[in-house]
Amino acid sequence: MTNGPRSTRATRYPDYDVLDKRTTPSWDEHTRAVIADRLATPLEPRFFNAVEWLAVTSLCARVVPQANAQPVVPLAALLDARLAGHSNDGYRDARLPPMRDAWRIGLAALDAECRERGGLPFASLAQDTQNALLGEMQRGELTNPAWRGMPSKLFFSERVLHDICGLYYSHPHAWSEIGFGGPANPRGYVRMYLNRRDPWEAVEARSDTHEHAAKENRRVR
């Protein structure tokens, strides 16, 4: 199985690709299977309807912008897959409805807020306008009846940020960006000291060590 194109993301770990570990002792078969499944996430929605899909795709792009990142973490697809599979955290704030309901209500309310102000849905707004609206959500200033009693501030913190950011950093492309080697099972991590690293960990580049770090990272397995 090929790893696809190497990441061109801006990172302090140049030329590091965690997927190079796929066939090494860093990952066991269970880890490989989990990562393969994550990389194969369907890009077409199974939970969200067409209107919700447009809204959540735009929302993900504002929470974690990836305009200059390749390859892109498919955030909306990962969220859709989680909801379609009835996966949840196993707990929730009592002021929020169940996860699937919260997302349906939240996206509908977000579009309702936008249409009330200018007649357009969230996905059709300029990015600056979208950002301003999300700022209002973060402060709990969105109170359209479409929220159905769910606090917009709580939806922002407990669903929007929690789910989208969590899904981003669950993906191997994001691991490569931050120099994370994944579960490292069964190999593990050994040199647990300040400024020490195992040979199978990524090398962080300093201002004068970019080429050295890139060379080392191409050999990391």
Residue ranges and their predicted role:
Residues 26, 42-43:
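A short linear-motif detector with a strong N-terminal bias
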Residues 25-28, 49:
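Ser/Thr-centered flexible coil motifs
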Residues 1-22, 34, 39-41, 55-58, ...:
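Mature-region segments of soluble proteins
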